Amino acid sequence: MAELCRMDSTLTALDEEMLWDMLESHRCRIVQSICPSRLTPYLRQAKVLGQLDEEEILHSSRFTNSAMRVGHLLDLLKARGKNGAIAFLESLKFHNPDVYTLVTGLQSDIDFSTFSGLMETSKLTECLAGAISSLQEELAQEKAQKEVLLRRCQQLKERLGLAEAHAEGLRQLEVDHSRMKREVSTHFHEVLKLKDEMLNLSLHYSNALREKELAATRCHSLQEELYLVKQELQRASLVSSCERESRERSLKMASNLEPQGEELNRLKEENEKLRSMTFSLVEKDILEQSLDEARESKQELVDRIHSLRERAVAAERQQKQYWEEKEQTLLQFRKTQVDCELYKEKMTMLQGQVAELQKERDQAYTARDRAQMEISQRLVEKDALRRRVFELTEQVCELRTQLRRLQAEAPGGPKQEAGARELCLRGKQRLVRMHAVCPPDDSDCSLLSSTESRLWWDLNSTSSREQMDSFRSSSPMPPSQQSLYKRVAEDFLEDPESLSFPEVLEMRLQGATVDDTDTDLEFEMIDGADLSQTEDSLQGSSRSLNVSESSVPVRRRPARKILSQVTVLAFQGDALLEQIGVIGGNLTGIFIHRVTPGSAADEMALRPGTQIMMVDYKPTKPSLRATLENTTLEQAVGLLRRVNGSCYLSVKINTEGYKNLIQDLDAKVVTSGDSFYIRVNLAMQRGGDGELQTHCNDILHVTDTMFQGRSCWHAHHVNPYTMKDMEPGTIPNYSQAQQQLLALIQDMTQRCTVPRKPPGGPQKLVRIVSVDKAAVSPLTSSFDQSQWDSGKEEGGPSVCFWSESCFTLAPYTLVHPHRPARPRPVLFVPRLVGRILGKKLCLLQGFKQCSAEYLSQEEYATWSQRGDIIQEGESIGDHHWITRHAVESLMNMSTHALLDVRLDSVRVLHRMDMFPIIIHVSVNEKTAKKLRKGLHRLGSSEEQFLEVARQEEGELDRVPCLYSSLAPDSWSDLDSLLSCVRLAIADEQKKVVWTESPC
């Protein structure tokens, strides 16, 4: 038998029984080592198996394992005779060369000239055979590489065992290693899920191809029936015409029978010719269609071969990547071992130092207790002296009242009082605490009560006598340098209701002319008569005070009445950001986080936890007046950096908000107090590590406008369905992004490209949006802004960031989220597409056309005043309007309202709390031809449709919300476009709605 099987040509020379004897002798090995799904395609192509046989072998429930399927395959091939055996051996040559060599004793070299002749040796067969041989070579290489990797892996396992023997004490590192293993397993499960999804997609694709083939066969049968019907119609018309002509000729030529017979024969010949021509046309069309299908199937096979090669390359690349990750993990493991040993040595040293520090701490506690006892005794003595001072001040007030009464009676009173004042000055300026006098329009709060006056006079008298003393002696700790004024401010901020209205504190800082050793400062009390005179003078003029300095000390600037617990501090803010440091943002507010000791801000008792509400800086022209309550950290820092002189800060104590912000910063939950959402109007590539790659119309969540102190923003991509933060990274701030936008537009202009995105083309690069600089927005930084509006009144809200209104390009746009519960209305761009699809969508459940209502002049005026008119019904005529009531009635019925309105009506719908779904169908000349019938029904041509589509697509950039686009190659006919539109509407209904204008 071995001698007969030396040459491949001898196989075909053997008879059927000898061939099947060879196969049956090795049947056990064949059944165990062969996969039937690999052989059936070749056997079916060799025409020894049919499609039903293949499905029975692969999918029959009678065969529970692969061996039973192979056995049934051999039985079927044995029924085919010699051709079945030869085809089976040739399939073994391709897919199981070792089994082929075992059965025949020949080498499995593939020679295209030695095929058995069961198949046509066409180019397709040669291509498939070459592809199979190349795949076998690649498989052999991969197996060899796998063996090398297995040996290498075994060596690494031995080294890892040695490393684990040296690392028995490092249990913490083992925990980290197990955690990494769990992460790898989760990633592996994710990969398996992705593979399952890919398999499902391939199954769906195969089902779609099968449905397509069924539809094509149905179309062919219908075409054949159509041709047959046409042929019968022509035959019937010819028969009727022939009968008519024969009848007429019989009447005219009844006597002449021979010419009539010749005419009848001629008509029969013409009828036969027409019938033969008709059948030839039908056969020609059928052959052309079958040829096209054969070409398409050939192209699909070639594409599948290319995809398999790409998957093999991707698998090799992924294997290399996993190998590199393993090497990096081992290297990191060794580095961690070394670091752990170093940390152990450092811990032993630190423990020794901590023991020494504990001893020193105990000694310091003992010394502190002794000092506190001495300080407590001295404070008790000071309290007694302070009570004595209060008694003496009352006597001074009584004596001063008597002195003024005597001065009024005596003619030389003013001169004596002036002399007395000169004696009391002692050569230095007084530090006076004066009462805040309200402007004339707040007459109810113009004066303090007598109790409040006495309280503030007592505090200032104590402050003027002894700066280093403490006003409250309950604390055993010694007072600070400016404890008097600080405690006055603390009492005011902690108990704002103790006064009749919020006080305005003002202090003039003194230079080095004041002697530190001299602590006696002069003070004056304002009695009721003087206050009455002051009130009268203020009512006469709100800008100047007519009371002389020698008589009554009053405020140089009237106190302004501020609602809520807000205090206005006036001080010298030279280089304000060097005196204080701020944190926060537009979500939490701007807080003072650091105060430089000895600065003017420290003298004014500003402390961490104080929230800055407003800043007023007069020296700039125009003056700087801004509210910092809703500004970002970048804006607040830019505004405070411009302050360099005398300024007014409106502050309030917000300990709870500051504490929450500090806790979040320490826990690294946030990096600042900023939080807002933006829509990106340009595409930005990833420039470096940590930078975020964005596309046009992406939604980002900005969480820090001064990330790590740099001029960049920290942002996250936003999940369109749940609003959860996803990929983090940094993006340029507003000014840098605006420069990139201008550079991108200039580059596009120099290249003479059209700014409009071509249909079905690449990702959109730029969205041209112009905004008014006068609009309030937390996006623009104070560096980019102009001067602030100085024409605002003090009581008016200072919200305008720009001195004059002009338009500028916006790289980012502020957006706000909405979650509508009811079905949203639907708009189509172009509108002609909506009119074409409207009738078919109305036939489906959940869609209905919103019709225009007829309104009289009175009804229109009433509805328009309420803001319930959306747009006039253009297709119907005058007095027909699309109203809010019509849209809401459909939304309440859980129905999508199909609107035929312009894009400028989107803002009107947003003001009504309606957020339409905008479906943009990209069109070109090819897609216009697909909609030709619908356009003709609407009385529009393809050129007009394309022109209108370009105009409406240009208006999409001005729409204050996102929209869904359908590419031209995503649909082939009107039915597929309808299904794509339904899927897009369902997907948009699930998403969060982002609008640029707050609703």
Swiss-Prot record:
Organism for this UniProt entry: Mus musculus
Modification Phosphoserine, positions: S541
GO cellular component, one term: aggresome
GO molecular function annotation: CARD domain binding
Domain PDZ as annotated: residue spans: 572-655
InterPro entries: CARD, DEATH-like_dom_sf, Guanylate_kin-like_dom, P-loop_NTPase, PDZ, PDZ_sf
Region (Maintains the protein in an inactive state): 409-565
Subunit note: Interacts (via CARD domain) with BCL10 (via CARD domain). Forms a complex with MALT1 and BCL10; resulting in the formation of a CBM (CARD14-BLC10-MALT1) complex. Interacts with TRAF2, TRAF3 and TRAF6.
Protein name, per record: Caspase recruitment domain-containing protein 14
Subcellular location: Cytoplasm
GO terms classed as biological process: apoptotic process; negative regulation of apoptotic process; positive regulation of NF-kappaB transcription factor activity; tumor necrosis factor-mediated signaling pathway
Main subcellular location: cytoplasm
Key words of the record: Apoptosis, Coiled coil, Cytoplasm, Phosphoprotein
Keyword Cytoplasm (UniProt): yes
Alphabetical list of PROSITE patterns matching this protein: CARD, GUANYLATE_KINASE_2, PDZ
Domain of life of the source: Eukaryota
Reported function: Acts as a scaffolding protein that can activate the inflammatory transcription factor NF-kappa-B and p38/JNK MAP kinase signaling pathways. Forms a signaling complex with BCL10 and MALT1, and activates MALT1 proteolytic activity and inflammatory gene expression. MALT1 is indispensable for CARD14-induced activation of NF-kappa-B and p38/JNK MAP kinases. May play a role in signaling mediated by TRAF2, TRAF3 and TRAF6 and protects cells against apoptosis.
Coiled coil segments of this chain: 125-411
UniProt domain Guanylate kinase-like: residue ranges: 803-986
Note on domains (UniProt): A linker region between the coiled-coil and PDZ region holds the protein in an inactive state.
Domain CARD, first and last residues per copy: 15-107
Matching SMART domains: PDZ
